[in-house]
Amino acid sequence: MKTSQVIQNSLRLWLKFSNANAFEQATRQPVIAQEEKLLSIIRRNRYTEYGTEHQFAKIRSVKDFQASVPINSYDTMTPYIERTLHGIPDVLTADKPLMFATTSGTTGRAKYIPVTPSYLNEYSHGIHVHTYRMLADYDNVFEGKALVSASSDIEGYTEGGLPYGAISGYLARTQPSFIRRFYALPYEICTIKQVELKYYLMLRTSLTDDVRLL
């Protein structure tokens, strides 16, 4: 059996028992699963500045949450985010952010979204479920390479000393080596700021590999 096939089979088993099974069980009772997830987030952040202001410690249900927490926009959250950007802890999240994801949104003004370890854990769970289903449906997909487009995760640093940039670049840079071996592109291409050059190198580099996944 090829080394890639051994890795693929091992990965599929790990994904199945780590996240895929739990996700499939949650789909049988999605309302309950979503409420449990919401309440776990509330409990984890109940002693933050935002959590204290909105009485997270008293929230026991979705209705409690709706009554305690107003509908927000980025503008209404900006004062909290600004303090987090300056390195003040426990404002929005109990976890210290690893970085800030940036997006221009619809206004053109840069928006900074705190990326915490617990968020990355949840984000990874979704990727794991997707990857498991892909491996189950296309058993030879990882005999080739994956063309993963990402941008730099370090475009600059906040006043608090944390990097800001693209979360896709952070994930590409921090993947384990046994996952990176399936990537068609080296991380260094992600850091190129000149868009036309970056995409040319992405296409040119991928031509040398058996790309089976975009």
How should these model regions be labeled?
Residues 1-33, 38-55, 59-214:
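Active-site phosphate/ATP/adenylate-binding loop shared across adenylate-forming ligases
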